[in-house]
């Protein structure tokens, strides 16, 4: 009796066309390293195999230290910056970001010292801020511009090396100033939040300045729309357990909701 082996059949077909597992790994790594990142669907089409097989390949390659897995794909371990230009990000999920920023305005009070990161959601927060006596500390040039016509708001700029991509200041000078300030609360966003409660950033420059701002703050508030959930990026910024409140626009997954409840993290929709 002939027993059909799907595994043997697949291996024979791949070998016949020169696309065995090793060659497939090479194809996957070459494409991801060239593009910086790739989705599971994209890789499945290029390798002409199932999405499930690609997921297994990516998990195996991550264990070998050859790439980083993300939700729905993978990124190159040679990549140092996965961030998008600010002028692109400001229009993505703009309605949701404005909604979240408006809800976070309840945090404001007179004479507060407020830290604002260089995220597009913080930029919406800066635009919506009423002109009340307070101080804003920021590394974002666009936050400065948003506040320039609000005379009651004093703005402290971190200085540092200017990034035209992010329209913000970074580096040792920025971090040096933040280490010497006392901030009542900071507003920041991120590139992703996974179901284990880890908060991710697209590059070390952003992550490092945000960490220093959070360390200088009595309270830290995360503003993140639904597109950030179940998603990783390049650099782990911190954990949700380190923040006080999460402002968002959608319900959390059961896993993430349980994490927030366990760690007493308030979630505001």
PLM ranges: what are they?
Residues 120, 141-142, 251:
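Alpha-helix/helix-capping structural signal
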Residues 70-71, 138, 157, 269:
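A generic structural-conservation signal
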Residues 2-4, 8-27, 31-47, 52-118, ...:
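HTH-adjacent hinge/linker in prokaryotic transcriptional regulators
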Residues 4, 13, 17-20, 30, ...:
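Conserved phosphate- and dinucleotide-binding cores of soluble alpha/beta proteins
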Residues 27, 56, 99, 124, ...:
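Short Gly/charged-rich anion-binding patches and loops
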């Amino acid at each position: 009796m002939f027993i059909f082996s799907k595994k043997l059949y697949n291996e024979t077909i791949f070998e016949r066309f020169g696309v065995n597992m090793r060659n497939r790994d090479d194809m996957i790594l070459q494409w991801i390293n060239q593009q910086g990142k790739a989705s599971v669907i994209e890789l499945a089409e290029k390798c002409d195999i199932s999405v499930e097989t690609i997921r297994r390949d990516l998990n195996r390659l991550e264990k070998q230290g050859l790439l980083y897995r993300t939700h729905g794909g993978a990124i190159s371990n040679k990549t140092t910056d996965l961030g998008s230009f600010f002028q692109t990000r400001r229009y993505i999920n703009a309605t949701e970001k404005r909604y979240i920023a408006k809800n976070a305005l309840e945090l404001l009070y007179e004479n507060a010292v407020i830290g604002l990161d260089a995220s597009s959601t913080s930029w919406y927060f800066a635009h919506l801020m009423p002109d009340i006596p307070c101080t804003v500390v920021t590394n974002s040039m666009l936050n400065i511009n948003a506040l320039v016509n609000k005379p009651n708001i004093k703005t402290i700029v971190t200085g540092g090396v200017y990034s035209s991509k992010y329209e913000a200041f970074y580096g040792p000078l920025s971090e040096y100033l933040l280490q010497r300030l006392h901030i009542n609360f900071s507003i920041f966003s991120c590139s992703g939040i996974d179901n284990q409660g880890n908060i991710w950033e697209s590059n070390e420059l952003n992550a490092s300045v945000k960490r220093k701002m959070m360390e200088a703050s009595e309270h830290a508030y995360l503003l993140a729309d639904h597109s950030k959930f179940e998603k990783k990026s390049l650099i782990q910024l911190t954990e949700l357990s380190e923040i006080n409140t999460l402002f968002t626009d959608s319900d959390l997954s059961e896993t993430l909701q349980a994490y927030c409840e366990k760690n007493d993290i308030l979630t505001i929709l």
